[in-house]
Amino acid sequence: IALGGHSGAGFAFDNGGPQHRVLLEPFAVSNRLVTNREWDEFVADGGYQTASLWLSDGWTWVKGCDVVSPLYWRRDDHFTLQGWQVRHPDAPVTHISYFEADAFATWAGFRLPTEFEWDTIARGQASETAAHDPEAGNQLDRAAPCQPTGGSGLFGDCWQFTRSGYLPYPRFKPADGAVGEYYGKFMSGQFVLKGASCATVRGHSRASYRNFFYPHQRWQFTGLRLAKDL
């Protein structure tokens, strides 16, 4: 049994609560993010041409939008300091959609973690405050340090897709005013992301924060780590 949701210490949006109990079966989550090098292997192995790897809607999206690589990837012999940058093979892959993350996980023989599995790894035996990476937030030139529980890049590198739909927690009640209008009406057809990116403000870099994208969206430093059942 694990606790999901915001603990009540400090500011949180209403979609992060209330805190509740979640039953988790034995699982393992990778202690690092998937890299550009690994994604290159996926591409070279025909990942974007193999329908069996993709969800049905994902395959329709790939074919309909001519998707052959993560957003912003291109092959070019020339670049400038102000323009295109060479991809570092060992840097986390970013700007991918949920469809792509799920297809890669299937190809690799794993799956995406649930948001509550991710939370459990991020919090470890510590409180949410202790799990918060003090270096996170706008760290465009450096990677986040490893967490005490062994997870590398949990906070501050990229938003990480989970397989959990963006839905209300038990006993959730939308807040009054604009905040409730925003979060409550978007709880349909989207997936939860965790971890915060290099462009995320410090206050949003915490274990309980729930970002959410539609499965085809890949614009804000989105990446993944792998999980499996034990």
Name each model-derived stretch:
Residues H20-L23:
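Acyl/amide activation-and-transfer machinery of modular secondary-metabolite enzymes
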Residues E181-G184, N211-R218:
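Short proline/glycine-enriched turn/loop segments at secondary-structure junctions
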